[in-house]
Amino acid sequence: MMIEIGTTKYVIYAKVIVDGYVEKHDIIGAIFGQTEGLLGSDLDLRDLQKSGRIGRIDVELENINGKSYAKLIFPSSLDRVETAIIAATIETLDRVGPCIATIKVLNIEDIRIKKRQYITDRAKELLKSIVDTTIDTYEIAEEIKEFVRSEEIIEMGNEKLPSGPNVEDSDTIIIVEGRADVLNLLRCGIKNAIAVGGTSIPESIIELSKKKTTTIFTDGDRGGELILKEAIQTCDIDYVARAPKGREVEELTKKEVVKYLRSKIPIEQYIQFHSNKCNELLKKSKEYRSNTINNNNDSGKISIDSIISENATNDIGELPVSKTSKNERNNTKVIDENIEKNNQNIKEDNNIEIKQSDISEILKKDCSEQWEYIESLLNDISNTDNIKIITNDNIIKTIHYSELDKIDKSDIQMVMSDMPITQKITDLFHECSPIIIGRDINITKKPAKLKVFSHDMLKNMVCL
C-alpha cells in the first residue's frame, strides 16, 4: 500500500482481528469512537486528523470463515512521544460493532530515515553521473598539447618527411623510423627529429647528415636493425641510440627517451663493439660517401651485411655504455684517418716505458702464465661494460665503466677492459701511471707516464 509522505514523520503499523464479519468503515468508526475524550482535546484523533497532524487511516481488510483480519496504517506528523501515545491508545480498542476485537501495533516507522536513505542513494547516482561526464583538466590540457604537437610536425624535402620544427635550424638532428616516433619525441620536448618513413633512407636525410651532427634512434627490433645498417652505409652518422629489445621509440616514456639518447655512442665505437672488421667498414663507408658525392651514383655502395656479421658479439640492440662529449667525438673522427699511425706510436712508446718485470710484479705470475691469467680475467668481463682493476695492494676488483671517474685512481696499478680504450679513459688517468689494457686503442694523444696496450700488443709482448 502506497501512502503520501508529505509532512509525515512517522507511520504506525497495526493489525486487527475481529471475531465476526465487519467492513472497513466499522473498524475506522470504532477507533474514533472508542478513543474520543480518552486523551483530552490535544490528542483527540478527530481534531488531529482535521488539523492534518494525523493522516488518512488506510485499512486492508480480509473476511475469512466468518472472521475479519485487517492491517492499519496511521501516518503521523506528531513528534515521537505523541506518536507513541497515539499508538498505545489504538491498542485499547476491544470491540468493533457487536463483535469482539483485538488490535496490536506492529511497528512505528521513522519516515525521515527512509528519506535520508533515499537522499544518500540518489546523491550517489547523481554524483556518479557527474563524474562520468566530467572531463578532467589534465585530459583537456593533454588534448590541447597533442593538437599543438601534431601541428608542429612539418614536412621536409621532396619526400615530405615528417619532422620536428627545428630540424632545419638545429646543428644536430635525430633520425627515427616513422611519424609516430617524431610525435613522441615532440611530446618529450625534442623538436629536431626527422623520420625515415620506410625501410630505405631518403636522399633528404643523406644530405642533412653531411651537414649536421646526426644521431640515429631506432626501434629495438629487426626493422630497426635493418634501417640502422642502411643508415651506417649511406649516411654520415655520428651517434647511435636504440630502444630496448622488443620496444619501439613511439611507446617510450619521456624519461626513457632521455635515458637512451643520453646513452648514445659514437658510430666508430658502435661498429667496433659489433665487429672485428670495424676499420674495414669505416674505410669502405667513407669511400662510399666520397664516391656518392663525386660521382652521384651507386658505384661505391657496399653491403653492410658483409661487414657486420649477423652473429656479432651480442644482439645488435645492446649498446656499450658511453657518455662521450662533443670534443671526444671530434677526436674520434681524427682516429679514422690516423689510427694505424697512432697505434704504432703508442706501441713504440710502451715498449720503451714498460718492462716485462712490471707485469710480473703486478700479476705475481711467471712469464709463461701471464697471458693465460690476463685472458681469464678478460673473459670474466667479456661482452660487458665492466672493467677489472688491480690496486696497489694487488687486490682485483670489478667495477662498471661508468664508475671509473669516481674511484681513487692513485691506488690503481692496472686497468683491464674488453672495450676499446678511448681518449676519455686515458684522460681520467693523466696524473697516474697505471697499465691500461683494452681490446683496441682509439686515442689521439697519450700522457707521457701512461702505459696503454691492446690485447694483441700485450699478448705478443708477454709471450716473447
Swiss-Prot record:
PROSITE patterns per record: TOPRIM
Signal sequence residues: none
UniProt: Mg(2+) 1 binding residues: 177, 219
Residue ranges that the Swiss-Prot or TrEMBL entry lists as coiled coil: none
CDD domains in the record: TOPRIM_primases
InterPro entries: DnaG_primase, Primase_DnaG_arc, TOPRIM_DnaG/twinkle, TOPRIM_dom
Keywords: DNA replication, DNA-directed RNA polymerase, Magnesium, Metal-binding, Nucleotidyltransferase, Primosome, Transcription, Transferase
EC number: 2.7.7.101
CC terms in the record's Gene Ontology section: cytoplasm; DNA-directed RNA polymerase complex; exosome (RNase complex); primosome complex
Co-factor binding details: Binds two Mg(2+) per subunit.
Catalytic reaction annotation: ssDNA + n NTP = ssDNA/pppN(pN)n-1 hybrid + (n-1) diphosphate
Keyword Magnesium appears in the UniProt entry: yes
Residue span, Toprim domain: 171-245
Cofactor: Mg(2+)
GO biological process annotation, one example: DNA replication, synthesis of primer
Pfam family membership, one: Toprim_4
UniProt: Mg(2+) 2 binding residues: 219, 221
Described function: RNA polymerase that catalyzes the synthesis of short RNA molecules used as primers for DNA polymerase during DNA replication.
Quaternary organization: Forms a ternary complex with MCM helicase and DNA.
Protein's name in the database: DNA primase DnaG
Lineage of the organism: Archaea, Methanobacteriati, Methanobacteriota, Methanomada group, Methanococci
